[in-house]
Curated annotation (Swiss-Prot):
InterPro entries assigned: Asp/Glu/hydantoin_racemase, Asp/Glu_race, Asp/Glu_racemase_AS_1, Asp/Glu_racemase_AS_2, Glu_race
Binding site for substrate: D28, S29, Y60, G61, N93, S94, T205, H206
Gene3D superfamilies linked: 3.40.50.1860
Role this protein plays: Provides the (R)-glutamate required for cell wall biosynthesis.
Pathway assignment: Cell wall biogenesis; peptidoglycan biosynthesis
Gene field: murI
Family: Belongs to the aspartate/glutamate racemases family.
This protein's name: Glutamate racemase
Protein's UniProt keywords contain Cell wall biogenesis/degradation: yes
Lineage of the organism: Bacteria, Pseudomonadati, Pseudomonadota, Gammaproteobacteria, Enterobacterales
Pfam families the record matches: Asp_Glu_race (PF01177)
Amino acid sequence: MPMKPLDGETTSTEKLSPVLRPTVLIFDSGVGGLSVYNEIRTLLPDLHYLYAFDNVAFPYGEKSEAFIVERVLDIVTAVTGLYPLALVVIACNSASTVTLPALRARFAFPVVGVVPAIKPAARLTRNGIVGLLATRGTVKRPYTHELVARFAGECKTEMLGSGELVDIAEAKLHGQPVAIEEVRRILQPWLRMAEPPDTVVLGCTHFPLISEELQQVLPQGTRLIDSGAAIARRTVWLLENESPEVLSADDNMALCLEITEQTVQLIPVLQRYGFKTLKKLAL
């Protein structure tokens, strides 16, 4: 795809040079990765961002590991055919738990994954009970249990897997109201506890999008923790130390696997996040 320079302001004698920036790809199966993108953009507002989401295979939570690995490799490979990438963020917990080794083996650029914020939650809990709210797939994976054993061994960790909350977050971004009673029903296993978790790890990037609704339902004072800020800091460090040589002057762009009526409804939302266009990515 040819690179189109951004129009600069003109002087009386010449047009200013376009701003050249490293290209960073943020990938998720759905729109949850926008929560991570927002954190990165806060620290690095002037990068060239691509946001790719797999609206054909969404959600990934119940997909097999082999499927997710092959799918994500294919998508990132397709994006590299459009732009030389400085860095990729896999802003999807389900994908991060299984794809990072394969991605790092294939590509030379840094690949950053999402890790549930178990370690900071274990430090912050006051009653020694940490909740992990994630997809059912993430809750079941050995990687997640290893994290808990390594960083929260002295805490009691209550895991709750839900695919419905992912759908609720997606629907919210599409402009649909959130049914608080449905959120309450999903969280009942914790709400019925005599002493529920006082610190909850949002182990899916969709869940920060509904943090207000979660706070309405969970006991007052419950802390919600996600990995977005840590990923943003890691991205800053990598770009400062990698010094990418290939730069772009293009506008930020969103990519999906299929243009549907539902994805068209997302265009105003994506524009509010700074993405000028939405295009179909061919695999």
